[in-house]
């Protein structure tokens, strides 16, 4: 078990690491050749030019102004200067609300920490229960545990203090959550009301279009919406399966990068042609001329791309039973997106379309009927992933409990002979080991989310974040506590009756605070400080700049600003909320470490959002109900654990008074859900009508159809250098097929005449396009 000395060694290592990271960052950010890495957002907005273009040759690469190095931490106050309204305009509402999660942590835990240290620490410290348990029952403990509830004897009246504090912590947390929910809801409504025109405001995604033997998907979609939304339907774009085409385009881009590299290399030294080997990684195989080889490969794959495009456009099997349908007004889109279209609730399913940059195109090709099966498979896979990950978690706990294991395994005693090494192993290594084990988890969870078939990047990230949160709850928290308790009290477990084991675990739960303190310092202190260095984007930018960049456009594409990473960042924040709320009434020693994390992370990520991150999408803070719900879950878990802990301490008179807390907390959650959540899942028709009215008054001659015409065209049909225009293949729908007649024997309320019946109907234009 980590002692106070071990915690001190870990704190020293992590504080030193964070300080070194900040110094390195301060030096690197001042160098002109790194300007595009550490200020990439300003370059993407076109508001910053490279300082390396002017001045002396040396000044283009190295900052020779030594006065700038004297203020190496001035980026911290600068990150706090930009006011929130300006930050919303600069980075979007998603980024600002994400920052408010850190601010929420500070608002919740600062008063809680002050109250806990003022009231609970003296109550816990003035007892000798652990000393007596150590002598009588051979229970392992440290000086830090004397500040916890474990140090209070059974049947003590002092437990009433912890119950009163639990009520105080709950009331304060719920109050802050309610005020924040109200603020975020108002920010969202105001943001949506003042937001510039976007295609997704007028568009819905229609899925599970029923098959029809007589009509194509495009014709069927048009007929359905002309009949059921006759005054509001504007245009649509059917979805196609272009995944194979997208893979070919991606492969061609890689080949083009290699060709650019070898052409640039040959231009610098044209004394001899460049030769490459065709074998694995260029280590063996036939030698060929590099430039000629890649020109031939690009020509070959270009022909494949053209052929695949023809197949996608002309093959009915490539057309999916889904479409992006656009309307003349936001009001009409809101009505369609938020209502059931037919008596069969499994057909003609409508939802708000993601904004074009948020669409995850490859998943649109997944048949809707297979989504349930896919999600069931992923639920099972996630269960086994979570279950089997308990093994490395138990290994991490063994690193954190050397002293306890030595009691049962004396041959390991040589490990703890050196006090400093023992402090490093127990105070630093467990946190590092756990962080390494979790390194690949976000990628695995994102792959699982993609397999489930979500159609937008934002929904993918929210699902991955939810699974990461559950994983942290089960493995990082619960498994660490249970496995750690078993390791720490191993000798006690082996020499006591079975009915005494729950009591030993109850005493041991607060003792795991030492492990979580070390993890917070590794992940929340040094880890957050290391984020600002951006080592991977920095290295990749300079490699691309050296070998691939030929133009300013190439240099812009070489930048990798990244984003806030909701799927990884938010679950980590929620783990700290969970730890803080669980240990606030149990071991207040942990709270200052959490406060340092929230304060440091708020400053670092505010700087990154202002200067670096380029958000991939804008959901107008649609994720906030998830954030609120997980904090509530952490609060309920903390109450249940405290109730169980007091039960093991035989606080029979005091413990029942905690039963009301989870009930009241869940009731509070339902109140907030009913009061504020509708602003995040539905678009008020009143707001939509107001925005439409204002836009009509300001732009009476707006060509909305032209604005929406190509908004949801698949990216593989856009901006390619090949002389290919999808409208050339589908222009007949615009020019020749002004009216799309039905081909059925009988059809009521058809806005176009039937080919067979010849009934008259008003002419209505068709504007369907292929996505």
UniProtKB/Swiss-Prot annotation:
It comes from the Eukaryota. InterPro entries: Csc1-like, CSC1/OSCA1-like_7TM, CSC1/OSCA1-like_cyt, Csc1/OSCA1-like_N. Acts as an osmosensitive calcium-permeable cation channel. Specifically conducts cations including Ca(2+), K(+) and Na(+) in vitro. Inactivation or closure of the channel is calcium-dependent. Mechanosensitive ion channel that converts mechanical stimuli into a flow of ions: activated in response to membrane stretch and poke. Belongs to the CSC1 (TC 1.A.17) family. Pfam families: PHM7_cyt, RSN1_7TM, RSN1_TM. GO terms for molecular function: calcium-activated cation channel activity; identical protein binding; mechanosensitive monoatomic ion channel activity. One of its GO terms (cellular component) is plasma membrane. Activated by hyperosmotic shock after mannitol or NaCl treatment. Activated by mechanical pressure: activated in response to membrane stretch and poke. Membrane lipids play a key role in mechanosensation by acting as a wall mainly formed by lipid head groups. It comes from Arabidopsis thaliana. The gene is OSCA1.2. It is a multi-pass membrane protein. It is found in: Membrane. Changing residue 536 to I: Abolished activation in response to poke. Changing residue 335 to W: Abolished homodimerization, leading to formation of a monomer. Changing residue 77 to R: Does not affect activation in response to poke or stretch. Residues 741-771 are annotated as: Disordered. The keyword Nucleotide-binding does not apply. Changing residue 531 to A: Decreases the stretch-activated single-channel conductance by 1.6-fold. Homodimer. Changing residue 75 to K: Abolished activation in response to poke without affecting activation in response to stretch. The chain crosses the membrane at residues 5-27, 101-125, 157-178, 375-401, 420-445, 463-485, 505-533, 567-588, 590-605, 626-648, 652-670. The keyword Membrane applies. GO terms for biological process: monoatomic cation transport. Changing residue 435 to I: Abolished activation in response to poke. Residues 28-100, 179-374, 446-462, 534-566, 606-625, 671-771 are cytoplasmic. Residues 1-4, 126-156, 402-419, 486-504, 589, 649-651 are extracellular. This is Hyperosmolality-gated Ca2+ permeable channel 1.2. Keywords: Calcium, Ion channel, Ion transport, Membrane, Transmembrane, Transmembrane helix, Transport.
């Amino acid at each position: 078990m980590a002692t106070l000395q071990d915690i001190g060694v870990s704190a020293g290592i992590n504080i030193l690491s964070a300080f070194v990271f900040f110094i390195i960052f301060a030096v690197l950010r001042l160098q002109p050749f790194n300007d595009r890495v550490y200020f990439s957002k300003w370059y993407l907005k076109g508001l910053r030019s490279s300082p390396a273009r002017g001045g002396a040759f040396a000044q283009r690469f190295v900052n020779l102004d030594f006065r700038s190095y004297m203020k190496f931490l001035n980026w911290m106050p600068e990150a706090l200067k930009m006011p929130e309204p300006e930050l919303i305009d600069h980075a979007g509402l998603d980024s600002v609300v994400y920052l408010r999660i850190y601010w929420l942590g500070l608002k919740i835990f600062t008063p809680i920490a002050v109250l806990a240290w003022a009231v609970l620490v003296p109550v816990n410290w003035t007892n000798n229960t652990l000393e007596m348990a150590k002598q009588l029952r051979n229970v392992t403990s440290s000086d830090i545990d004397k500040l916890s509830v474990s140090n209070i004897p059974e049947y003590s009246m002092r437990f009433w203090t912890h119950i009163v504090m639990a009520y105080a912590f709950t009331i304060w947390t719920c109050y802050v959550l309610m005020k924040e929910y109200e603020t975020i809801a108002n920010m969202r409504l105001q943001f949506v009301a003042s937001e510039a025109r976007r295609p997704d405001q007028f568009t819905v995604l229609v899925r599970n279009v029923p098959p029809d033997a007589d009509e194509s998907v495009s014709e069927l979609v048009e007929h359905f919406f002309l009949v059921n939304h006759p005054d509001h339907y504007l245009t649509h774009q059917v979805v196609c399966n272009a995944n194979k085409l997208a893979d070919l385009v991606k492969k061609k881009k890689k080949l083009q990068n290699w060709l650019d590299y070898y052409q640039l290399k040959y231009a610098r030294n044209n004394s001899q042609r460049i030769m490459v080997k065709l074998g694995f990684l260029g280590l063996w195989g036939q030698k060929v001329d590099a430039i000629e080889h890649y020109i031939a490969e690009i020509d070959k794959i270009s022909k494949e791309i053209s052929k695949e495009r023809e197949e996608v456009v002309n093959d009915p099997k490539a057309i999916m039973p889904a479409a992006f349908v656009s309307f003349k007004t936001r009001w009409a889109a809101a009505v369609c997106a938020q209502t059931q279209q037919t008596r069969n609730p499994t057909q003609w399913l409508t939802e708000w379309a993601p904004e074009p940059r948020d669409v995850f195109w490859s998943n649109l090709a997944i048949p809707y009927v297979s989504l349930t099966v896919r999600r069931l498979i992923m639920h099972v896979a996630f269960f086994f992933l979570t279950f089997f990950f308990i093994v490395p978690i138990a290994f991490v706990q063994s690193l954190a409990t050397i002293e306890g294991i030595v009691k049962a395994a004396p041959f390991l005693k040589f490990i703890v002979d050196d006090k400093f090494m023992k402090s490093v192993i127990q105070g630093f290594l467990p946190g590092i080991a756990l962080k390494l084990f979790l390194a690949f988890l976000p990628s695995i969870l994102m792959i699982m989310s993609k397999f489930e078939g979500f159609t937008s990047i934002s929904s993918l990230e929210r699902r991955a974040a939810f699974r990461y949160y559950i994983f942290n709850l089960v493995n990082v928290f619960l498994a660490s506590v249970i496995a750690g308790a078993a390791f720490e009290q191993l000798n006690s477990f082996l020499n006591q009756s079975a009915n005494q084991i729950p009591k030993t675990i109850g005493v041991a739960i607060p003792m795991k605070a030492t492990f979580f303190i070390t993890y917070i310092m590794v992940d929340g202190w040094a880890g957050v400080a290391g984020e600002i260095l951006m080592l991977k984007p920095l290295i990749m930018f300079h490699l691309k700049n050296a070998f691939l960049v030929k133009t300013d456009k190439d240099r812009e594409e070489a930048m990798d600003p990244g984003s806030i990473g909701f799927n990884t960042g938010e679950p980590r924040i929620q783990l700290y909320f969970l730890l803080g709320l669980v240990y606030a009434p149990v071991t207040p020693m942990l709270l200052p470490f959490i406060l340092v994390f929230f304060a440091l992370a708020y400053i670092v990520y505010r700087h990154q959002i202002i200067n670096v991150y380029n958000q991939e999408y804008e959901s107008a803070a649609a994720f906030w109900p998830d954030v609120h719900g997980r904090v509530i879950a952490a609060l309920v878990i903390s109450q249940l654990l405290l109730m169980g802990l007091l039960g093991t301490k035989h606080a029979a008179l005091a413990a029942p008074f905690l039963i009301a807390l989870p009930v009241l907390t869940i009731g509070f959650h339902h109140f907030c859900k009913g009061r504020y959540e509708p602003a995040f899942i539905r678009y008020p028709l009143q707001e939509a009508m107001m925005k439409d009215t204002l836009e009509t008054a300001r732009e009476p001659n707006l060509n909305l159809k032209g604005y929406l015409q190509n908004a949801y065209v698949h990216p593989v049909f856009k901006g390619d250098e090949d002389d290919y225009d999808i409208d050339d293949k589908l222009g007949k729908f615009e020019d020749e097929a002004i009216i799309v007649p039905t081909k059925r024997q009988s059809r009521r309320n058809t806005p176009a005449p039937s080919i067979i019946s010849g009934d008259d109907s008003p002419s209505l234009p068709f504007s369907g396009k292929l996505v």
